[in-house]
Design a protein with these regions (language model features):
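Helix-biased detector of long, well-ordered alpha-helical tracts
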Residues: 2-302
Length: 302
């Protein structure tokens, strides 16, 4: 549980630390204190010019994502702890999509001077929590200033057995298309949060009741990567012909696979699983469930 208690009263009594007073290297040292190592393959982590990672007959997998405030997230309803967690998870998900296991990440941030050291601590709490949950080592990154807002860039490094790698280009004739879980919930969670924000702007005294939308909001604020699926495939000696993670919605992802594989595909709308809460909230927001599933995105299913 990543409960976000109201700390406003505490904050008034605490003197917060300006980032300029610790400096970039002081900040790196501060972050380094809470970073633990989980993998033997990590030879050198944070604090050198480059991380050093040992590999054998495995392929290295490397993936990068960038999140920009005002484009990818809105801090008025997105707690920094959750943001840090989600930034890591979305990258681990890319490694899963190659049938690999994520081992290391680097995190780079650009911050404006409105962020204090204590607020960035919350971001790194979420990052460290995801590292612990998925047994991933944070091995480096960069920090710099930005004119306004927060930018986070995460690079994930993983490994895959060279005989078990799954690319987008492997789909074959008569392959069955399978999705690892529910789709569309994260998008609906975002709609709920956006609606509550608009209500709050009109009436700052209103208290949002998110309880009925708990699962949807959690899917948006704290998604998980399907490492369990990769373990399942390994345990059962299954190597799919092709895989992709659903970050942008089912339709664009399946088109990526089709284009890379030189294939077409048929999707049956009656065979696509529609969660009860999805149907209920689609009705409430006057949205078409299939459109939400096809174009919603950020589900991080495979």
């Amino acid at each position: 549980n990543m409960g976000h208690k109201n700390k406003e009263t505490d904050k008034k009594n605490l003197k917060l630390t300006d980032l300029s007073s610790v400096g970039e290297f002081g900040f790196i040292e501060h972050i380094k204190k809470n970073v633990k190592k989980y993998n033997e393959s990590t030879i050198v982590g944070i604090g050198d010019d480059s991380a050093v990672i040992k590999n054998s007959n495995l392929y290295s997998l490397i993936s990068t994502d960038m999140l920009v405030e005002g484009v990818h997230f809105d801090l008025s309803y997105f707690p920094l702890k959750h943001l840090g967690y989600k930034a890591v998870v979305s990258n681990i998900s890319d490694i899963c999509a190659m049938n690999g296991i994520c081992k290391q990440i680097t995190v780079s941030i650009a911050v404006s001077n409105r962020f204090k050291l204590e607020t960035l601590n919350e971001l790194y709490e979420g990052i460290n929590l995801a590292c612990k949950r998925y047994k991933v080592d944070l091995v480096g990154g960069d920090t710099t200033s930005s004119q306004k807002g927060l930018i986070i860039s995460v690079t994930a490094m993983g490994v895959v057995d060279n005989k078990k790698i799954c690319q987008r280009s492997g789909a074959k004739n008569n392959d069955l298309i399978i999705v690892s879980g529910k789709l569309g919930l994260a998008y609906l969670g975002l709609q709920v949060l956006e609606r509550e924000k608009q209500v709050f702007l009109v009436n700052p005294n209103s208290k949002p009741d998110l309880e009925p939308y708990k699962e949807l909001v959690e899917r948006q604020l704290k998604p998980e990567a399907r490492t369990d699926l990769i373990n399942f495939l390994e345990k059962n000696s299954i190597v799919p012909t092709s895989m992709i993670d659903i970050s942008d919605g089912l339709s664009s992802e399946i088109i990526h696979i089709c284009n890379s594989s030189g294939m077409g595909c048929i999707l049956y709308s009656d065979k696509i699983y529609k969660d009860q809460s999805l149907l209920k909230v689609c009705d409430e927001f006057n949205l078409d469930p299939i459109s939400v599933i096809m174009s919603g995105g950020e589900d991080y299913e495979i």
